[in-house]
Swiss-Prot record:
Organism: Rattus norvegicus (Rat)
Compositionally biased region (Basic and acidic residues): 43-58, 232-267
Name of the gene this protein is made from: Epsti1
GO BP: cellular response to lipopolysaccharide; cellular response to type II interferon; gene expression; homeostasis of number of cells within a tissue; inflammatory response; macrophage activation; macrophage differentiation; protein localization
The name this protein goes by in its record: Epithelial-stromal interaction protein 1
Function comment: Plays a role in M1 macrophage polarization and is required for the proper regulation of gene expression during M1 versus M2 macrophage differentiation. Might play a role in RELA/p65 and STAT1 phosphorylation and nuclear localization upon activation of macrophages.
Amino acid sequence: MYPRSRVVGPGLGTSSSSRDHAGAGQHGELDLQQNQRQNLEVAEPKGPKLERQGHGDQRSTGTYTLIAPNETRRQKIQRIAEQELADLERWKQQNKAKPVHLVPQRLGGSQSEAEVRQKQQLQQMRSKYQQKLKRDEAIRIRKDAEEAELQRMKAIQREKSNKLEKKKQLQEDIRRATLREHHQSKTAELLSRLDTDRTNRSACNIAPPAAQSSRWKLPVLLRDPSRAGSQAHKDSPQKEDNQKLQKTRDGHQKNKLLETKGQHQEEERAQIHQAEHWRVNNAFLDRLQGKSQPGGVEQSGGCWNMNSTDGWGI
């Protein structure tokens, strides 16, 4: 094994220990030079191979390889570092805190201590009422918001109900129009049938004399049961239609009579109510007139209102 020894190449300068302890400069340098010589002497018998490696910037001594520093690069790095330090110092000088210049003033405000304490006491006394006012204001704001929301919902529901009402009204109008058309068509059909029956009946009534004479001559043909049944079958729809028309007319007349009777009753009721109102007013005015007179009821001999319908005697 190679002996362990401290080796410092030429140009590396002092080691880290020499930088930390600058007081032991010469003694440390002598020790380093002696150790370097011993290492070189030990490395010489190794042969020509180590001599070839020692040429140039690299030099191998035992287990260590010494590399000489690049002076140009080192100087460049140092120059850049110095420039940056100078820039930093310049920036610090430019951006250092400036002195503050304030106008001197009297501290403590323009009020005395007694006034301040009195103001604090008043604020303390009013704080309870101020908190109550704040709570009331918050409650009022919340109620206003709730009322606005309720009104908005009511408006929405009202709009929905209006739309539904319009839809129902439209359906009702369509239904009434359909019913009216159906009624008109049925009425026209009934009238056309009645006109047809009337024309047929008039044609039957206006028969030729030969037919009438044959009827008198051939009474057996008129008494034929098959012809009688067919004639009855033809007359039955006409009778039903006539009955329906008669019932409809009777219903209209009855409704008109009921409406007229109701109007008369309403007029009589209104007249009775008006007469009663007049009677009560006259009685009240008579009582007021009797109270305003000096003798009152005694001067009138017990009959204080002979003209009014509400008069009475003692």
